[in-house]
């Protein structure tokens, strides 16, 4: 009887661990392309210039968890238009790699910069709207944006 009980408990343990174990790993790792979309794409953009846009978006998009991301740019154009930049003029990235591309036209963007007096967890940003060319790094198959390099 003791062996049957042990076998039953062991089987139950294996079953429970089979359910619990996948959740122990946490969320699946975010791809570089998905991270680019989360951190830089806001196709709607602010309905009108708002000084609190960056504070709201940086928090909503998870860039103030654990620390305040010092600088970020949001692009207010359709994702397809930004992805198309990957087939436009190739330029050298800031890090020296050759997988960056410059947009052939200017795009609507918002630059967010952490204010000097701001300290985590109270991340406070300046919001600057503009129209500029952007430089993005592209990678993968399909060849898609994975890093925002600069705006010019």
Curated annotation (Swiss-Prot):
Gene3D superfamilies (UniProt xref): Ribonuclease A-like domain
The biological process GO terms on file are: defense response to Gram-positive bacterium; response to bacterium
Question: Which residues act catalytically here?
Answer: 40, 147
SUPFAM superfamilies according to UniProt: RNase A-like (SSF54076)
Q: What does it catalyze? A: an [RNA] containing cytidine + H2O = an [RNA]-3'-cytidine-3'-phosphate + a 5'-hydroxy-ribonucleotide-3'-[RNA]; an [RNA] containing uridine + H2O = an [RNA]-3'-uridine-3'-phosphate + a 5'-hydroxy-ribonucleotide-3'-[RNA]
Q: Which domain of life is it from?
A: Eukaryota
Q: Does the keyword DNA-binding apply?
A: no
Signal sequence span is 1-25
- Which residues make up the binding site for substrate? 35, 38, 69-73, 94, 113
Pfam families in UniProt = RnaseA
| Subcellular location field | Secreted
- Tissue and organ distribution: Pancreas.
GO CC, any one term: extracellular region
- On whether Electron transport is a keyword of this UniProt record, the answer is no
Q: Which InterPro entries did the record assign?
A: RNaseA, RNaseA-like_dom_sf, RNaseA_AS, RNaseA_domain
User: Its Enzyme Commission number?
Assistant: 4.6.1.18
General function of this protein:
Endonuclease that catalyzes the cleavage of RNA on the 3' side of pyrimidine nucleotides. Acts on single-stranded and double-stranded RNA.
Family recorded in the similarity comment: Belongs to the pancreatic ribonuclease family.
Q: How does it assemble?
A: Monomer.
Report the protein name in the record. Ribonuclease pancreatic beta-type
The organism encoding this protein is Rattus norvegicus (Rat)
Q: What is the lineage of its organism?
A: Eukaryota, Metazoa, Chordata, Craniata, Vertebrata
């Amino acid at each position: 009887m003791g062996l049957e009980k042990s076998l039953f408990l062991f089987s139950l343990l294996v079953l429970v661990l089979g359910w619990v174990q996948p959740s122990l790993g946490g969320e699946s790792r975010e791809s570089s392309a998905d991270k680019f979309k989360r951190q830089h794409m806001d196709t709607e953009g602010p309905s009108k210039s708002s000084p609190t846009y960056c504070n709201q978006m940086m928090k909503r998009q998870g860039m103030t968890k654990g620390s305040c991301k010092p600088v970020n740019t949001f692009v207010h154009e359709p994702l397809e238009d930004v992805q198309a930049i990957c087939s436009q003029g190739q330029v050298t990235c800031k890090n020296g790699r050759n997988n960056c591309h410059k947009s052939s036209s200017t795009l609507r963007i918002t630059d967010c910069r952490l204010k000097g007096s701001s300290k985590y967890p109270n991340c406070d940003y300046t919001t600057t709207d503009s129209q500029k060319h952007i430089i993005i790094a592209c990678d993968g198959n399909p060849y898609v944006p994975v890093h925002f390099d600069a705006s010019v």
